[in-house]
Amino acid sequence: MLGFVTGVLAISAHVIVSQPNEHSPVVVARETYGLRDVIFRRLRSYETDTASARAEEGTSDIEERSDHEIPPDFYKRLASTSTPYVANLSHKAQIAAQALRKDAERSKGALELLKKYAELEGKMDAPKEEKNHVDRLKAAAFKEWNEKGLNLDQVRVLFADNKRRTSKYENLIEKIVGEYEKS
């Protein structure tokens, strides 16, 4: 029975780790992977604690014991020590997902502004409506950044979608940051 429970826990821990989740940062994934290690460490420590009893019986593994030979409090102790750890991981994952959503919303305006600037940069005779649209986006973004009290370095970070894309628009980013500094 314990072999079955151990197998189920190992498989579920592997599934948790192997399933991609875009809202879960690497730190939470590492801690989730650590859950499997915690469970196996606790199983090994239980085996170590009862090593002398097994040596007398001639058994080497807890999996070799039948259900009635395993102390009834073993599952209870394992669950009581593992459940808070799992609950804590779930809470951390929720907090991390909320932070990622906030960051995505915050940088969304910056990336949209950069995209519109790039579109206007290529056009010599851009229609007045497009220029007005960019000005409205810029005013809204600058207002939001001023309310949050962002400094110039923090504004540059908002545009850091990925390295390749950022280096392509470096001049435009500096232009936007310069305009933000003047405002």
Swiss-Prot record:
Family that this chain belongs to: Belongs to the RxLR effector family.
Intrachain S-S bonds: none
Record's signal peptide: 1-18
Coiled coil: none
Motif, RxLR-dEER: chain positions: 41-65
Native organism: Plasmopara viticola (Downy mildew of grapevine)
Function according to Swiss-Prot or TrEMBL: Secreted effector that dos not suppress the host cell death induced by cell death-inducing proteins.
Domain notes: The RxLR-dEER motif acts to carry the protein into the host cell cytoplasm through binding to cell surface phosphatidylinositol-3-phosphate.
Subcellular location field: Secreted; Host nucleus; Host cytoplasm
Keywords per UniProt: Glycoprotein, Host cytoplasm, Host nucleus, Secreted, Signal, Virulence
Gene: RXLR41
GO cellular component, as recorded: extracellular region; host cell cytoplasm; host cell nucleus
Name assigned to this protein: Secreted RxLR effector protein 41
Glycosylated position list: N88
